[in-house]
Curated annotation (Swiss-Prot):
Organism (species): Shewanella frigidimarina (strain NCIMB 400)
Residues that coordinate or bind K(+): L172, A173, P181, I183, I186
Residues annotated to bind Mg(2+): D105
InterPro entries: 5-3_exonucl_a-hlix_arch_N, 5-3_exonuclease, 5-3_exonuclease_C_sf, DNA_polI_H3TH, FEN, HhH2, PIN-like_dom_sf, Xni
Function: Has flap endonuclease activity. During DNA replication, flap endonucleases cleave the 5'-overhanging flap structure that is generated by displacement synthesis when DNA polymerase encounters the 5'-end of a downstream Okazaki fragment.
Protein name: Flap endonuclease Xni
Enzyme class: hydrolase
Gene3D superfamilies membership: 5' to 3' exonuclease, C-terminal subdomain, 5'-nuclease
Lineage: Bacteria, Pseudomonadati, Pseudomonadota, Gammaproteobacteria, Alteromonadales
């Protein structure tokens, strides 16, 4: 069975960079990213590995909702300029990169789902909880920084929902980290309570007459922003990609 390790490039690099005392010390970032990548290869023993990077084109999500990810700290210039050397260092060790046109998340989701549909296994290395919406069969979410599998079931219990309700939950409650708005006045607890009772967003909107007047009004007035929030949170798993998996094949790692 083919086993693909997909590393969310900027997620890894920016977190490594953030803990360094000198933000201009890109050589240390380079060394640590390579060491981390080698460690993952040794741990997971994949047949293929790729590092997926965000591109520079504007995200379609930003076009849909201009405040998407608003206020997020820009990448330091030294790090941005150093990415080309980081990619080159990885490539020297047969860890090849794939550059997305815009956000890496949709590319990662597309590649992962295609691999799984072809009876392969996938490990996604990222701390981005958005990947928890993907089907879990033959898919592992690996948190390199905590050295553990991201437990989707535990995350669902924490939110008080089931996996299939994840996008409906964000449509209602939003996602502050990505500046996805959700419906004003509907917080995580209310969203979970509503989904526990009505199961899906569609069924909830068919049942507004069964709610109190105040809550029903909030939901009615927020229907369009809920639709937008759902779309913003939803990973695209069908992006056309010109990619040959053979270029990402790696030799077995022994040390």
């Amino acid at each position: 069975m083919n086993k693909l390790l997909i590393i969310d490039g900027l997620n890894l690099v920016r977190r490594i960079h953030a803990v360094l005392p000198d933000e201009n010390d890109i050589a240390s970032v380079q060394e640590r990213v390579l060491a981390a990548s080698k460690k993952m290869l040794l741990q997971h023993q994949p047949t293929h590995c790729m590092v997926v990077w965000d591109g520079n084109e504007p995200s379609w999500r930003k076009t849909l909702y201009s405040d998407y990810k608003k206020g997020r700290k820009p990448m330091p210039t030294a790090l941005s300029d150093g990415l080309v050397n980081i990619k080159a260092t990885l490539a020297e060790h047969d860890i090849n990169s794939f550059d997305a046109q815009s956000e890496a998340d949709d590319v990662i989701a597309t590649i992962a789902m295609k691999m799984i549909s072809n009876k392969g296994e996938v490990i996604i290395v990222s701390t981005d909880k958005g990947f928890s919406q993907l089907p879990t069969k033959n898919l592992t979410l690996w948190d390199h920084f905590n050295q553990q599998v991201f437990d989707v079931e535990q995350y669902e219990k924490k939110l008080g929902i089931e996996q299939y309700q994840m996008l409906d939950f964000i449509a209602l409650a939003g996602d502050s980290g990505n500046k996805i708005p959700g419906i004003m006045g509907i917080g995580p607890k209310s969203a979970a309570d509503l989904l526990n009772k009505f199961r899906t967003l569609a069924n909830l909107y068919r049942s507004l007459d069964n709610l109190g007047a105040k809550q029903a009004l909030k939901l009615a007035e927020g229907k369009e922003i809920a639709r937008i929030s759902y779309k913003l949170a939803q990973l695209q798993c069908d992006i056309p990609l010109n990619i040959n998996l053979k270029q990402f094949r790696i030799n077995p790692i022994t040390n």
